[in-house]
């Protein structure tokens, strides 16, 4: 180990930065966030330093490097564009036994600055020892995606509860189980982020009052339309914390590969017109697993609240008193249209967009008169089997027969395929496409030839 990682308490302690440019500004920002009493010495300063000085946040000393400024310092940073000056700062600090960082010169420095993930009071520092700053930055970005944004607030709140936890739970094992449930409780984290004191208190009391073995919850997560890169950061965090993942056919293999390795997986294989597991049984699976104390993720393609029957599943949980939360996903209409070069709205062609199910309950009927209106875009989910009917009804209610249409198969994935034509061809085009597929109807489809960026198919 070439360097010892430490965290410095700099609040109200004198620190010095030599340099007044962009690099020095970035270092100063970190020092100010840490509460340092900061002096900045340079020949010239970029405007941000003057702003900070006018606000009383730091002291500026204009002129050549003055090593007497180090006499009362705990820490120093040399951040000029002059290697000779930087070395003078380092030597002067070394003679006073003051730690000094020299920007872009780790061998001349007595400490190096890591890449930082700040979830105060939780801090994560990543360093390559100065050998590969880009690698450290890339690793930091990866860790940023794994750590929830609200983690700091949860950590602070945990500190307030430590005494109560110690008093209520006698053994280390019980305390560990409590904290494990506490830190993965998404509703608590969201309530803290919203400063919703009532919800925070209610969730906290439930955590303390229920037996440790029966604190399961369900999180509905939208997996997006296919491309794993479209899974949200919060969605990724949830599937990596799950004890069990209940998923269906629209969730891609690439996304399932991101699920925690030791999590149980339950495939329920839904698609339009075919359910490998009936919806009521899915509801009961979620309920049963949560009642066992498990953290259950219900992973759905697209967005769980847009033709995903997420509301029905949550009603079952709500009736049983099971805690739940929802992580939205990019819905198929948004993802497939973007990856097909078809804007859903456009000032010249469409002032509104309608998301329509093509899979109605028996006896159901759509409002075809309004659907056939001009200056809008229609997106039909689960509409392949009804494509001929959609074509017939829209024309019958006045939509122009030459209205452009597109069918997007396996949208946003490497298997994406788009077929397009006009409304009179819709039923025929549907025969060329397999599920999962989306139907887009509107003048905006005509822009695809210019705006298609993702594939030639």
Swiss-Prot record:
Q: Give the residues the record marks as binding NAD(+).
A: 22-23, 43-44
Q: Which GO terms describe its molecular function?
A: NAD binding; precorrin-2 dehydrogenase activity; sirohydrochlorin ferrochelatase activity; uroporphyrin-III C-methyltransferase activity
- Going by the entry's taxonomy, the superkingdom of the source organism is recorded as Bacteria
**Pathway field:** Cofactor biosynthesis; adenosylcobalamin biosynthesis; precorrin-2 from uroporphyrinogen III: step 1/1; Cofactor biosynthesis; adenosylcobalamin biosynthesis; sirohydrochlorin from precorrin-2: step 1/1; Porphyrin-containing compound metabolism; siroheme biosynthesis; precorrin-2 from uroporphyrinogen III: step 1/1; Porphyrin-containing compound metabolism; siroheme biosynthesis; siroheme from sirohydrochlorin: step 1/1
Q: Name one GO biological process term.
A: cobalamin biosynthetic process
Q: Which species is listed as the source?
A: Salmonella gallinarum (strain 287/91 / NCTC 13346)
> Could you tell me the keywords of this UniProt record?
Cobalamin biosynthesis, Lyase, Methyltransferase, Multifunctional enzyme, NAD, Oxidoreductase, Phosphoprotein, Porphyrin biosynthesis, S-adenosyl-L-methionine, Transferase
Positions of the UniProt region annotated as Uroporphyrinogen-III C-methyltransferase? 216-457
EC code? 2.1.1.107, 1.3.1.76, 4.99.1.4
Reaction(s) this enzyme catalyzes, per UniProt: uroporphyrinogen III + 2 S-adenosyl-L-methionine = precorrin-2 + 2 S-adenosyl-L-homocysteine + H(+); precorrin-2 + NAD(+) = sirohydrochlorin + NADH + 2 H(+); siroheme + 2 H(+) = sirohydrochlorin + Fe(2+)
- The annotated active site, in chain numbering, is 248, 270
Protein name stated in the entry: Siroheme synthase
Q: Which PANTHER family match?
A: SIROHEME SYNTHASE, SIROHEME SYNTHASE-RELATED
